[in-house]
């Protein structure tokens, strides 16, 4: 089941996508998206923050993340670009939302709307950007993940008895 915040992010990505293709005003995009019956289930405040926040200065946001692209900016699909713009805005402007949540949501949205491997590109770009804009939180998350992994040199417990040599 999708949360209201996930729905808000999905609608924001759809709005940013529409803006890229049709150069519509944010108000027109919002009106069009509100016609979708699922919009009522979205977190409206988050949707508006993301849509209007990104479309207020998309050039600045894209220039901040473009250095982390492993391809030319014009080769980034409109869906991937929309997801990246939304998540980059959220990483810098929504400090109360954990970076792991922002990145995971972006990956899932890229899987839903993007191409077969688009989510990997989104993950890579956002990982690098998060390390830049939220270095302390990024290191804490990274350290936590490292500590959760079993060490390669430690034996892993199994239900099978050890084989006799």
UniProtKB/Swiss-Prot annotation:
Q: Name one GO molecular function term.
A: RNA binding
Show the InterPro entries listed in the entry.
Answer: NusB-like_sf (IPR035926), NusB_fam (IPR011605), NusB_RsmB_TIM44 (IPR006027)
What is one GO cellular-component annotation here? cytosol
Alphabetically sorted, this entry's keywords are: RNA-binding, Transcription, Transcription antitermination, Transcription regulation
What GO terms in the biological process aspect are recorded for it?
DNA-templated transcription termination; transcription antitermination
UniProt cross-references to Gene3D superfamilies, sorted A to Z: NusB-like (1.10.940.10)
Matching entries from Pfam families are given as: NusB (PF01029)
Region entry Disordered, spans: 139-165
Keyword Disulfide bond (UniProt): no
Q: Which family does it belong to?
A: Belongs to the NusB family.
Function of the protein? Involved in transcription antitermination. Required for transcription of ribosomal RNA (rRNA) genes. Binds specifically to the boxA antiterminator sequence of the ribosomal RNA (rrn) operons.
Q: What is this protein called?
A: Transcription antitermination protein NusB
Native source species? Laribacter hongkongensis (strain HLHK9)
- Recall the taxonomic lineage recorded for the source organism: Bacteria, Pseudomonadati, Pseudomonadota, Betaproteobacteria, Neisseriales
């Amino acid at each position: 089941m999708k949360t209201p915040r996930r729905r808000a992010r999905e609608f924001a990505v759809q709005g940013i996508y529409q803006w890229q293709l049709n150069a519509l005003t944010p108000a027109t995009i919002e009106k069009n998206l509100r016609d979708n019956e699922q919009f009522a289930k979205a977190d409206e405040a988050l949707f508006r923050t993301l849509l209007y926040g990104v479309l207020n200065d998309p050039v600045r946001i894209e220039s901040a993340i473009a250095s982390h692209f492993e391809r030319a900016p014009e080769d980034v699909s409109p869906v991937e670009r929309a997801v990246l713009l939304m998540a980059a805005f959220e990483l810098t402007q929504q400090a109360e939302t954990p970076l792991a949540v922002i990145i995971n949501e972006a990956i899932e949205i890229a899987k839903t709307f993007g191409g077969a491997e688009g989510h990997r590109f989104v993950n890579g770009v956002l990982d690098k950007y998060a390390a830049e804009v939220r270095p302390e939180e990024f290191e804490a998350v990274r350290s936590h993940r490292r500590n959760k992994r079993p060490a390669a040199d430690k034996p892993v417990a199994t239900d099978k008895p050890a084989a006799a040599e």
